[in-house]
Amino acid sequence: MGTLSCDPEARLTTVPLARRVADGHIPETGLRKSCGIATLENGSGPGLYVLPSTVGYVNHDCTKAASPAYSLARRPSEAPLQDSSPGPVYFLDPKVTRFGRSCPPAYSMQGRAKVRGLEVTPGPGAYSPEKAPPVRQRNAPAFTLGSRLRQKPPDTSVPAPNAYTMPPLWGSQIFIKPSSPSYTVVGRTPPARPPQDPSEIPGPGQYESPDPNTYRQRRPAFSILGRPRTPRPLEDTPGPGTHNPEQVTVNRARAPAYTMGIRHSKRASTMVGDTKC
């Protein structure tokens, strides 16, 4: 069954099937789709969206429950298995259990030890305790006369006492020794006499004394300025009509504006609504 077409006459197409499908023709009858229905089918098809798969385990859709998956493997070989293990050649100690070693105590019998010969040690009669002085009593001094000691030849490598050059103790030259008093003799100083010329006497301004504010409480300081400027004469002062307050827009969006309405009639009553409702 075909669909309606915008053309006055529906005609069959002789183009291949793949081209008719791409052009939007119906492959069963070969009729072109109508204009109204074709505009409704311009959207993307189901194959355009790449949704995650719901089959398998890898990249499975997390919003869907996973279906059971099965794997097909080949049939196992029926050939006899070749045993390559060493077999029961391991020796397991029967005394070792999973709780530890379980066995009665065992003892070993050894041969007689070889007897050593008697040691040559002094007997009880070899000691003479009576010859020993009492331990807790004081003894008389005892001396021994020996041969004369051999004298060593004098050592010539040691310097003589006059070979040292000691620093003098005059002045403060050795810091570990107290220095002796030192004096210096200079020439006679001229007597202090006042100058004959008064111009040679220094004045108060010639002494470089520091500022007293540096080591005493700071004194008050004052500054002398010039005479203040006289005010302008009265004739130069602007009058009230010079200012235009209505044009000031510094502190507001626009200048204030006022409207003058008509005078209300004295006979007009006040509009009061019904208060009983």
From Swiss-Prot:
Q: Identify the domain of life.
A: Eukaryota
UniProt-recorded name of the protein:
Protein CIMAP1D
The Gene Ontology CC terms held by the record are: cytoplasmic microtubule
Q: Which UniProt keywords apply?
A: Repeat
Region Disordered: what ranges? 181-277
**Keyword Amino-acid biosynthesis, does the record have it?**
no
InterPro entries named in the record: CIMAP, SHIPPO-rpt
- Does the UniProt entry include the keyword Repeat? yes
- The residues bearing each STPGR repeat, given as ranges, are 122-148, 202-227, 238-263
Gene name, per UniProt, is Cimap1d
Q: Which organism is it from?
A: Mus musculus
Q: Give the family this protein belongs to, as stated in its UniProt record.
A: Belongs to the CIMAP family.
The record's Pfam families line, in alphabetical order, gives:
SHIPPO-rpt
Tell me which PANTHER family the record gives: OUTER DENSE FIBER PROTEIN 3-LIKE PROTEIN 2, SHIPPO-1-RELATED
